UniProtKB/Swiss-Prot annotation:
InterPro entries: AB_hydrolase_3 (IPR013094), AB_hydrolase_fold (IPR029058), Acetyl_esterase (IPR023508), GDXG_lipolytic_enzyme (IPR050300), Lipase_GDXG_HIS_AS (IPR002168), Lipase_GDXG_put_SER_AS (IPR033140). It comes from the Bacteria. This is Acetyl esterase. Belongs to the 'GDXG' lipolytic enzyme family. A motif (Involved in the stabilization of the negatively charged intermediate by the formation of the oxyanion hole) lies at residues 91-93. NCBIfam families: PRK10162.1 (NF007547). The active site is at S165, D262, H292. It comes from Escherichia coli O127:H6 (strain E2348/69 / EPEC). The lineage of its organism: Bacteria, Pseudomonadati, Pseudomonadota, Gammaproteobacteria, Enterobacterales. PROSITE patterns: LIPASE_GDXG_HIS, LIPASE_GDXG_SER. SUPFAM superfamilies: alpha/beta-Hydrolases.
Length: 319
């Protein structure tokens, strides 16, 4: 798509989204566009600090859990002593960026609104880790906490997965992995998916949307994919292109959230339409005027707060 033919996204977004886009952090250095991945990760962590201020306080513990790839960091948020379920949160960042700190406020709000224990899993980033390592680490963490639930004072009889962007793909892929390989980590009561990518190679929204403002041009998306996958054949794996998995049976209830001006929006629409066509429990909600990654900005955006609350309420309704 010739850039001039794309939608003028920054003219169309909501007033509160424009406020976020125009918010300057004076102490923040320029984005290291030509820097190393390590430098970009450092910048991303620094930039997200501002947006994580003011999150709900609650008991929080950090643990390392064993996997076949080595230990993986986790962070547990306890909103109350007797939680009805446990939610595993997988952060976004194109598989190459992000950590438990960049998504701390999101996890705290989700724990507060759901009153469920939330466990963030700091899966190994790409390109150091290639598909399907992140999924296998997530599954290993789930199994570990299922076996040690009493020691960590968590309720693993009912669990869920949640994630944003690349984390949404990992959330659903992990749930399908447990189903397909018949791994018992507790009943998967629901999956919460905010503006994920699920396997489309091209779409209307991928053509009309995406730019320097969201880091989701076609070139960006290709770069994330090449960093994450081990080889070309992985593009068709049912745990990367989730539309190649069996979505006609035993899919946990899915809350699917879309951002209006997100190039990945058609992934969410197709996922919803596929699940609904096969009578799999699901709900789709579009958040008008928003860009990809808007969930981070609940400090300024009521819509971001609403989207987290909607997901939390969907999950608790499944319990």
């Amino acid at each position: 798509m010739k850039p001039e033919n794309k939608l003028p996204v920054l003219d169309l977004i909501s007033a509160e989204m424009k406020t976020v886009v125009n918010t300057l952090q004076p102490d923040l250095p320029p984005w290291p566009a030509t820097g190393t991945i390590a430098e970009q990760r450092q910048y991303y962590t620094l930039e997200r600090r501002f947006w994580n201020v003011g999150a709900p306080e609650m008991a929080t513990r950090a643990y390392r859990v064993p996997t076949k790839y080595g230990q993986v960091k986790t962070r547990i948020f306890y909103p109350q002593p007797d939680s009805p379920a446990t939610l595993f949160y997988l952060h976004g960042g194109g598989f190459i960026l992000g950590n438990l700190d960049t998504h701390d406020r999101i996890m705290r709000l989700l724990a507060s609104y759901s009153q469920c224990t939330v466990i963030g899993i700091d899966y190994t980033l790409s390109p150091e880790a290639r598909f399907p390592q992140a999924i296998e680490e997530i599954v290993a963490a789930c199994c570990y906490f299922h076996q040690q639930a009493e020691d960590y004072q968590i309720n693993m009889s009912r669990i869920g997965f949640a994630g944003d962007s690349a984390g949404a793909m990992l959330a659903l892929a992990s749930a399908l992995w447990l189903r397909d390989k018949q791994i018992d980590c507790g009943k998967v009561a629901g999956v919460l998916l905010w503006y994920g990518l699920y396997g489309l190679r091209d779409s209307v929204t991928r053509r009309l949307l995406g730019g320097v403002w969201d880091g989701l041009t076609q070139q960006d998306l290709q770069m994330y994919e090449e960093a994450y996958l081990s080889n070309d054949a992985d593009r068709e794996s049912p745990y990367y292109c989730l539309f190649n998995n069996d979505l006609t049976r035993e899919v946990p209830p899915c809350f699917i959230a879309g951002a209006e001006f997100d190039p990945l929006l058609d992934d969410s629409r197709l996922l919803y339409q596929t699940l609904a066509a096969h009578q799999q429990p699901c709900e789709f909600k579009l958040y008008p005027g928003t860009l990809h990654a808007f969930l981070h900005y609940s400090r300024m955006m009521k819509t971001a707060d609403e989207a987290l609350l909607d997901g939390a309420q969907f999950f608790t309704a499944q319990l």
